[in-house]
Regions:
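Bacterial Sec-dependent signal peptides at the C-terminal "C-region" and cleavage site
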Residues: 15-24
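Short glycine/proline- and aromatic-enriched beta-strand/turn motifs that initiate or cap beta-hairpins
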Residues: 23-47
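Signature for the C-terminal beta-barrel architecture of outer-membrane proteins
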Residues: 25, 39, 69-71, 102-103, ...
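Surface-exposed loop and membrane-interface regions of Gram-negative outer-membrane beta-barrel proteins
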Residues: 57-94, 121
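Outer-membrane beta-barrel "beta-signal"
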Residues: 95, 505-519
Length: 519
């Protein structure tokens, strides 16, 4: 593995050091530490940005090693053709051609913030929310001309386009701008890590690094299918006397005819679960000039899938969301958006594919045997009944120094209450905010912070849930071109499936402390 690692580094370093592009390259390096899957790793990184005409390539060449010098092999795996492919594309943070809004724009790699149309389906989606412990190589594409605009995206080429979608927008129909969007997640389980590629995600795989085994009922370290496992359920009774038992030479004799085995974990390669949605939007610009614009629009979307009604226990089709009136405006450095929203029959969520989607994609529950079960985000839509309310958002550039962005969604209607065992009328609110420094001053080179919480009765109570994410990034100049960076991101997972977040064990902290430099 080390031989392959060194060879690739030599090739990449030689490429980006060639005379043809050396003068244009922005070479950034970093040393420091980062938290991955709860463990602290040291890192040495080289992140050159190579511009070639309208193209630009940002590499992410990082080696992680622990206190004992052991290299994290996950990003340098050459054991199979698939692993080699993923290892190579992991070394690219992004490749891009052009810029958003130009005639042609393509970006491959990290998708930090993606919107489709006015955002009824895709709003602020990110495939890099768990970076660097989860590296996704996405794709977004735009083709724009005077009469038609096309935009498409894929969340991760490594998972063979699990999530993808797009939008076609035209003003050629009676002069009215019309857009049609489509999004599908063909297998929602693909969002879970599967280290041994056996189809059983780590969270339900008793042997996450051994693709031969995945089930261990009694937790003794031996697979239920291992010939050396004589007592599958650990009840102290040998299951069967046969030739596996040392010294036994007789005919096979069943001693335990009541073996209580765990259920087989899901195999996501065979048991996929998809969801899709389509949307239509109409917009008309009332005013459109450089310093001021005002557009009114309307949107409607239909989600295609099924979820269980927790009251009737029936499986029902997903619902529709309607925005009969929306207003988007900008005045100088201020951008504003307002929408009136309706969910007439429930089983729908606005901004379904949002910044947190790669975390929300799968949640957890437990069966009567206390075994973890996987629940798709789609299945949670059955908890939403009829709702109506409003959405407002604002973004402002404060003197070229700070950029502030806020949005608030206030819906009220029927939501399923586990405590009461019925649908109850209550609030369903979402709050998102971010603040970033646009221009450094003194020793503070960069700073940003964000907070998001979705679909809770009151996001301002700051009670953590799986829909909560917090983060900040601070860069302080140390002189001589050195910048000390502290990057922190916190999200949450209800691993024990009890409906609440229980302390550190269900808190996902991604922390990076590094000293970056330019050379």
């Amino acid at each position: 593995m080390r031989r392959h690692l060194i060879t690739i580094l030599i090739i990449l370093f030689a490429t980006i050091s060639s005379n043809n592009v050396r003068a244009q390259i922005k070479n950034n390096g970093a040393i420091g530490s980062v938290t991955i899957d709860g463990k602290i790793w040291n890192q040495v990184a080289m992140r050159p940005l190579v511009p070639i005409g309208k193209f630009a390539v940002a590499f992410d060449l990082v080696i992680y090693f622990d206190a004992e010098g052991k290299v994290l092999s996950e990003g340098w795996d050459f054991s199979s053709a698939s692993s080699i492919k993923n290892t190579l594309i992991d070394k690219i943070y992004y490749i891009k051609f052009g810029n958003p809004g130009e005639a042609t724009y393509v970006r491959i790699g990290a998708l930090d913030k993606l919107d489709i149309g006015y955002g009824i389906l895709v709003n602020g989606y990110s495939n890099s929310i768990l970076y660097p412990q989860d590296r996704k190589i996405g794709l977004t594409f735009e083709k724009n001309n005077q009469n038609i605009k096309v935009k498409a995206f894929i969340n991760d080429l490594k998972e063979n386009a699990g999530l993808f979608g797009g939008r076609i927008h035209t003003n050629a129909i009676m002069g009215i701008p019309i857009g049609v969007s489509f999004v599908t997640d063909r297998n929602q389980y693909l969002g879970l890590k599967d280290s041994d590629n056996d189809g059983r995600p780590n969270i339900v795989d008793d042997f996450p690094y051994n693709n031969k085994w995945w089930l261990d009922t009694d937790g003794d370290g031996l697979s239920d299918y291992d010939p050396n496992e004589w007592d599958i359920d650990g009840d102290g009774i040998t299951d069967t006397l046969d030739s596996r038992i040392p010294g036994y030479v007789g005919d096979p004799l069943v001693l335990d005819d009541n073996i209580l085995k765990k259920d087989e974990p899901i195999n996501v390669n065979k048991d996929s679960d998809g969801i899709m949605a389509i949307a239509v939007d109409l917009g008309y610009p009332l005013v459109n000039n450089k310093n001021y614009s005002l557009t009114i629009y309307s949107q409607a979307a239909q989600m295609v899938g099924r979820a269980m009604n927790p009251e009737t226990k029936k499986i029902e089709n997903l619902g529709i969301g309607i925005i009969p009136l929306g207003v988007a405006s900008h005045f100088g450095s201020l951008k504003f958006k307002f929408e009136y929203r309706l969910i007439p029959n429930g089983r729908f969520e606005f901004d379904y594919w949002n910044r947190l989607y790669e975390i929300e994609r799968i949640s957890f529950a437990r069966n009567s045997s206390n075994q973890i079960l996987l629940r798709t985000k789609e299945s949670s839509l059955g908890n939403y009944g009829e709702q109506k309310g409003f959405f407002s958002g604002a973004s402002i550039d404060l003197g070229g120094l700070l950029l502030a962005d806020f949005s608030y969604n206030d819906m009220r209607g029927n939501l399923w209450s586990v405590k009461d065992g019925q649908f109850m009328e209550t609030n369903n609110q979402t709050f998102l905010s971010s603040l970033s420094l646009k221009k450094g001053f003194s020793r503070l080179k960069r700073a940003s912070a964000f907070y998001q919480q979705r679909n809770v009765p009151n996001p301002f109570k700051f009670e953590y849930s799986e829909s909560t994410i917090i983060g900040y990034n601070v860069g302080i100049s140390m002189g001589q071109g050195l910048v000390l960076n502290y990057i922190f991101r916190r999200s949450f997972r209800d691993y024990n499936a009890n409906g609440r977040i229980d302390g550190d064990n269900e808190t996902i902290d991604i922390t990076s402390i590094e000293t970056s430099f330019i050379f």
